[in-house]
């Protein structure tokens, strides 16, 4: 992947994905409840976030994820409006780290952290990780234009509510 990044950078291909992802199932508007308005979506969100929090705490407790230090949390504490959060991203555990830092912040009690994810992460993953990808306050992108209109409306609503959205630069 790193060699491909260098190659695409030299060639000016900044909009081409360097990862060779498997084909994905297209996410259509009727298959996503971005704002968790349906009762079933709300219940799954609560359950998934509780399971996800326990999973993260277990990773930290067993030293499978180590966060050596956190710099700049005071800046996050000052943000009182909706905000987009971004960071460098190369490891699947990056999302867990950002989630933990968010939970350490003063805003954790009255704000929610949504995560923008790839379409394939939402539609293709089976099992526990798939359940998390579909229900832990995720906002999947889509190759379907109608779905993306709904995505943008949801982003606007979330930011207007004062919540946060994590998006990685490569998305």
Feature locations, PLM:
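Membrane-interfacial terminal anchoring regions of lipid-handling membrane enzymes
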Residues: 1-83, 90-91, 157-161
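Soluble catalytic domains of membrane acyltransferases
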Residues: 66-171
